[in-house]
Structures are given as C-alpha cells and as structure tokens.
Amino acid sequence: MLYNNAADFEIAKVLKQDIKIYFDTLEETFATSGGKDFLVKHTKKIDSILKHVYKVATRDMFGDYLPMKNSIPLSLVALGSYGREQLCVHSDIDLMLVYKDVPGYNVKELIEKILYILWDTGLKLGHRVHTVDELFDVSKTDITIKTALIESRMIEGSSFIWMETQNAISQIRHDDVEEFIQQKLQEQEEKHRKYPLTMEPNLKEGVGGFRDANLVFWIGKIHFNVENIKNLPAHIINEKEYKTFRIALEFLFRVRSALHLVSKKKEDKLRLDLIPYVATILGYENSKKGHMRFAKKVTDSLKTVRLYSTIWIETLTRDYHK
C-alpha cells in the first residue's frame, strides 16, 4: 500500500500501528541490551522510520521520474541526543531538514509532505527547517541551536547538501568559542543549583547527570572536533579514568531508559515512588535492601560522572575562567 498511491494519512496510519508494536516490545529489547547499546538500537529504529517516510514522500512526489537522492537538494539531519545516538525512549526526536531552494525542485512541498506524515504517526517530533545558507546566522540567535548543530548527524537525503551543512557547522564550531564556553559553564552552574544531588536526582539536568557528560563532549568537539569523549587528547583524559567514567555513565543510561519504560513517558527525575519499579526492571531484589542498593549505585554513579567531568572540563576550559 505504501508505494501504490496511498493517501498520506493511510501511510501514516500503517506506520503508527508499526510504531505501536515496536514500542510494545521495547522492554524485551531492553532486557537483552546494554545501556548505550539500547539507545543506539532505538535511534536506528527511528532512523529507519524517517528513511521510510523520505522514500515514500519522494516516490509520491516524483513518481516514475524519481531522481537520485543526491540530486534532490534536501537532507534529513538528527540533532541533540538523537544526533549523538543517545535517544531515550520517550524523548523528543530532534530533526532538522536542510535544503537548497533550487528552481525545478519543489523542495518545500516535499518537506511539508514528510512532516505531515511524521506528525500523523504520533512520533514526538521536534523539527527545524533551514536552508544551508541560513545555518550560521541561525546558530548565532540561540546557544541551544548552536549546541544541537555541533552534534548533528545525517540520516537520509543528499550527501551534497550534508557536505555543505558540515562546512557550515565547521564555521559555526569556530565562531565565538570563548562566548560559547562561558555560556555553557554558566548554564551548568544554573542547572546544578536548580537540580542538586538529592534522594530524587534529575538524571539529565542535575549534578553528575548526562548534561555534565554532554558538556565535556561539547567543549571537546569545539576544541578538537572529536566524535566522542574517549578521543580527547591523552593529556586531558587517560584510559583508566575514562573506563571508570564510562561504567558509571553506562549504568545511568540503563537507569534512565528503565525510568522512561516504567513511567511510559519522558521522565528524568528518579522519584522515590518509582525506585522499586526501576530497580526491579534492572534486576535488583524487590526488597527494601535491594532498593537501597540500587539507589546507592545511582548516587555513586552520579558522583563519578560529576568528578571526572569536572576534572576534564576544568582542563579544557582553564583559559576561559574569569
């Protein structure tokens, strides 16, 4: 049906049912996956849905005269945690559609078709639409946008547009480096004040949470264009430190995924009433002692991430402290 001139809403209806079946089986997938591995699997599944929608939309637009992908001036780009392949189950899917307004291609209509189908599937989509030439100016309007752009990843579409996008991102990465770092450090301080390490920690925004780990990556990306933290230079990070940090982070990935699965929604605060359910899904004994062991490991892991991220951020930013 998807390739036989079906209406967009019919396509979305079929995809919506497939997505529901997929989400219903996530706990089984989680049980046999590691922390980051589960996030990568989920990310790849979302990638496959977006690629499918792109394929359907382009075939519908061009029919028997479908050009090569590289000839259609549009790329679908993942941003944020989706770009890092760390997309949690109920987190928003941050998508950017980058295009060039080339005469002869009705790219804007194609973009609308893609978005309408995706909206109708029920996916929690956050999207941006920009021409390649807009990216630099857009990045200067909001530090959140700049941050998202420097951790972007191509999903589908024209590799030519993606190459131009990468060139724009390289320019963005080198622009106002000191101001970017100062703003991110200030942002971190504010988040730590708002979400201190308590008995109900915020795994994303709080002390020792994913934002601390992300900040190491963002600053490392700005300075060294690394693809992950472990690729930072040896004078900043050593293998033993990284291994300890990574074990803690891997555990927190599993905790956050379990928290989303148990809550059946986006939830980053490990509330006391949820601890028994999250602990159980992670294999801890369903008893007060088991719950306490789990809560202690969460706290210890957050402290580990906080410790090493602080050391590395201090080294990476020592020239920018005022």
Q: Where are each of the predicted segments found?
A:
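A nucleotide- and high-energy phosphate-metabolite-utilizing enzyme signature
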Residues: M1-K322
